[in-house]
């Protein structure tokens, strides 16, 4: 289950008083969405996925491994990288390497051992 790709948003040019987007509204994504997306993953994980083992995909604002780690701790079994690819095409490699090092520091052999590992 994919959790949060975009949320409805709008921007207005205050001088022309017109919408900045041709369709008036659009989807907010990237780093601005990240904290909202992490909370949504956590909510769905606690309500459904933890007990049902439903796979969750965290989406929104993954620019570095720490962002992916937040999704994993919140309950995501996978993480999608969109904006990060525009910023740096090597983002997926850097994220994977960072997650592997993090897992070792956490004392586990696999990143998957940290899914839903948020300590309240």
Specify the residue positions occupied by each region the protein language model found:
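Alpha-helical structural signal in soluble globular domains
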Residues: 43, 47, 74, 94, ...
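Conserved, mostly hydrophobic/aromatic
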Residues: 1, 44, 71, 110
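Glycine- and other small-residue-rich loops at beta-strand/loop junctions that grip anionic moieties
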Residues: 29-33, 57-61, 84
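Glycine-rich phosphate-binding active-site loops on the catalytic face of alpha/beta enzymes
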Residues: 2-10, 61-62, 67-94
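Generic secondary-structure signature for well-ordered alpha-helical cores
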Residues: 46-50, 100-108, 120
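Glycine/Thr-rich beta-alpha phosphate-binding loop at enzyme active sites
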Residues: 2-50, 54
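C-terminal helical cap(s) of enzyme catalytic domains, especially alpha/beta-barrels
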Residues: 12-26, 85-108
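A short, charged, Gly/Pro-tolerant segment at domain boundaries
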Residues: 113-120
């Amino acid at each position: 289950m994919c959790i949060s790709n975009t949320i409805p948003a709008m921007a207005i040019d205050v001088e022309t008083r017109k919408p900045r987007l041709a369709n008036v509204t659009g989807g907010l994504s990237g780093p601005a969405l990240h904290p909202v997306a992490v909370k949504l993953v956590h909510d769905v994980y606690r309500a459904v996925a933890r007990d049902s083992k439903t796979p969750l995909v965290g989406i929104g604002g993954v620019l570095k491994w720490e962002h992916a780690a937040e999704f994993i701790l919140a309950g995501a079994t996978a993480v999608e990288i969109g904006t990060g690819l525009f910023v740096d095409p090597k983002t997926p490699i850097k994220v994977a390497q960072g997650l592997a090092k993090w897992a070792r520091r956490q004392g586990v052999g696999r990143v998957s051992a940290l899914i839903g590992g948020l300590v309240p």
